């Protein structure tokens, strides 16, 4: 056998001979040491062992994998091997392998045709098993989830800019509270037809008749001094939903302040669907996002994330998680997640 032999030392596999040319320069494995020697991270060494491109004394692929104490190692290996098979070069996100290793990521994936020698990054990659719990605020770049059958599903994660050009509404208006909604008996024409607040009592075609407002819509208008009612909308909202109402109200207000119209997402299984550029009720445009409102410290399982992303994708939208506190005045954190095909 002509394959170089490595030795395990301080948690890495060191390989000499022509290792730099053979592994790093030509295929993006490892990191250079002195001369032609390189260090391989365990996941890189495992992949080369499996392919028969490396020898380690008295060890084969099964014994090497079983000897790694990190319980998440094999999940990371499956993702590493999958991306290698797809033609990508990637490096472990650790000191010595990449400059400024990204927090919460396990790999740095490079653009096709690029590798660790030029640091042309495609994305930072977080790896998780399907039974893990993930803090949404720690997600960025891309996420790879390995399910119980060892299949890998990829998601892209970003922080969207929420902005639109929809019309506002400022005419003083009166409403009556009725259980968990409000009714504007004599609404200004612009309330529904231009600003897209509420629903006409007798159907969408009758924009000048009585308008039903959700408690969120009514609370937002009341807070801005536009709507007056015969009772406290906030108190009613808290009675109906507790802290969840105030979190949803914070997100609703943030959308409206950015020129975006949020409407109920109930029929899609979400909190909101949103419209960025409403010119009139007859020209709504496409609803780009489905929005789920969650507490700032919320953790989700990969299964829950996958369900939400699949739900949004099925109706040609993208899922946004809005992380908001209940009535503390802080801005929501927006996290968008979608399917990714490497």
Question: Where do the model's predicted regions map?
Answer:
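Long Lys/Arg-rich low-complexity intrinsically disordered regions in nucleic-acid-associated proteins
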Residues: 1-342
């Amino acid at each position: 056998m002509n394959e170089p032999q490595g030795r395990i030392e301080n948690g890495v596999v060191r390989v000499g001979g022509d290792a730099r040319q053979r592994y790093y320069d030509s295929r993006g494995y490892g990191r250079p040491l002195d001369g032609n020697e390189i260090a391989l991270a365990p996941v890189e060494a495992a992949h080369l062992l499996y392919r028969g491109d490396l020898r380690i004394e008295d060890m084969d692929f099964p014994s090497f994998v079983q000897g790694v104490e990190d319980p998440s190692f094999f999940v990371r290996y499956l993702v590493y091997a999958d991306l290698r098979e797809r033609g990508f070069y990637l490096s472990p996100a650790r000191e010595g392998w990449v400059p400024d290793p990204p927090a919460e990521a396990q790999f740095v994936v490079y653009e096709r045709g690029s590798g660790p020698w030029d640091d042309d990054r495609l994305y930072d990659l977080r790896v998780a098993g399907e039974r893990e719990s993930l803090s949404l605020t720690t997600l960025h770049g891309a996420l790879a989830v390995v399910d119980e059958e060892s299949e890998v599903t990829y998601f892209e994660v970003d922080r969207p800019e929420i902005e639109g050009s929809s019309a506002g509404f400022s005419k003083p208006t009166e409403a009556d509270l009725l259980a968990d909604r409000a009714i504007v008996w004599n609404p200004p024409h612009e309330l529904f037809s231009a600003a897209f607040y509420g629903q006409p009592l007798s159907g969408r075609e009758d924009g000048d008749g009585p308008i039903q407002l959700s408690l969120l819509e009514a609370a937002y208008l009341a807070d801005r001094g536009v709507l007056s009612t015969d009772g406290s909308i906030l108190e009613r909202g808290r009675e109906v939903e507790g802290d969840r109402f105030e979190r949803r109200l914070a997100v609703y207000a943030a959308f409206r302040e950015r020129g975006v119209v949020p409407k109920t997402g109930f029929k899609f299984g979400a909190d909101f669907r949103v419209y960025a550029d409403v010119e009139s009720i007859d020209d709504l445009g496409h609803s780009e996002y489905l929005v789920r409102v969650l507490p700032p410290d919320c953790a989700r399982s990969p299964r829950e994330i996958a369900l939400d992303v699949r739900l949004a994708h099925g109706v040609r939208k993208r899922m946004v998680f809005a992380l908001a506190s209940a009535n503390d005045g802080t801005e929501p954190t927006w996290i968008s997640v979608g399917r990714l095909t490497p």
